[in-house]
């Protein structure tokens, strides 16, 4: 995930997951000659609690001699201006921040997504009628983003923190059913775990299989376009007999590459 001597910036919320991740990397940084830093985005959605979490992260990094980058955004105001949800706005702000830091410091950004997060995301995407890619789960690596804890359960992470005596904060909004993901976490997943106590691992295996299928279809779509290409266009006689799934993928690839309004 990170090359020897590389730079990694931990997305630090102050919760158990990111505290565990930072602690792991601090323990490993000398062995692998890593430059470890951290970043924190204050969404200002929880009043004083948001500020308290930010100060917690500052103190944690000070104690571990870790450089911390902090950005503050009024997500409520911005989401209203853009007419999008708090969740979408917050995510956009986070990844904009990550992209800036990754480019500036030639760094990998380590997020603390775990196997429970992956399960929640997969279920959420199912309810939205997601494609194969959407059902492939949260990738362990995507561009500059790495997720070292994606195969580790939230329970194991909390046990780790307890074992090392690590303090962390709890986001009060995670305790309510205000957000869709929380409804899934509190109401759907407990039932699934009654049916299959290892459901996180089962879904991870499913994600892996679907990811391989999605990759095969994507490569097949790319090959079809290569075969059918003629100058700046494509020969319909080369496309019409193609497998419908591969043809749909080829069209999706074109839509991603070309402004559909100009076709």
Model regions and ranges:
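Contiguous mid-protein beta-loop-alpha structural module that forms a pocket-lining wall or clamp
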Residues: 146-236, 251
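Core alpha/beta nucleotide-donor-binding catalytic domains of modification enzymes
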Residues: 1-187
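Short coil/turn residues that cap or connect secondary-structure elements
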Residues: 49, 130, 195, 243-246, ...
């Amino acid at each position: 995930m990170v090359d020897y001597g590389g730079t990694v910036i931990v997305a630090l919320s102050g919760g158990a997951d990111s505290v565990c991740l930072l602690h792991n990397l601090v323990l490993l940084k000398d062995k692998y000659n890593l430059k470890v830093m951290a970043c924190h985005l204050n969404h200002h959605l929880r009043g004083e609690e948001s500020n308290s979490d930010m100060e917690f992260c500052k103190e944690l990094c000070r104690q571990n001699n870790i450089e911390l980058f902090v950005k503050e955004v009024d997500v409520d105001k911005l989401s209203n201006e853009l007419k999008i949800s708090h969740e979408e706005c917050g995510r956009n702000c986070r990844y904009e921040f990550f992209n800036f830091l990754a480019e500036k410091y030639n760094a990998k950004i380590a997020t603390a997504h775990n196997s429970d997060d992956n399960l929640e995301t997969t279920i959420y995407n199912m309810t939205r009628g997601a494609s194969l890619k959407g059902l492939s789960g949260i990738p362990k690596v995507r561009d500059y983003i790495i997720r070292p804890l994606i195969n580790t359960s939230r329970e194991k992470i909390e046990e780790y923190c307890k074992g090392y005596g690590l303090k962390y904060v709890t986001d009060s909004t995670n305790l309510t059913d205000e957000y869709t993901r929380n409804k899934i976490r509190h109401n759907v997943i407990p039932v699934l775990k009654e049916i299959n106590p290892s459901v996180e691992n089962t879904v991870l295996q499913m994600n892996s299989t679907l990811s391989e299928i999605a990759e095969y279809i994507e490569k097949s779509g790319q090959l079809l376009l290569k075969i059918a290409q003629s100058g700046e266009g494509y020969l319909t006689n080369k496309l019409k007999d193609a497998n419908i799934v591969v043809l749909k993928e080829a069209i999706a690839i074109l839509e991603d590459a070309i402004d559909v309004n100009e076709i």
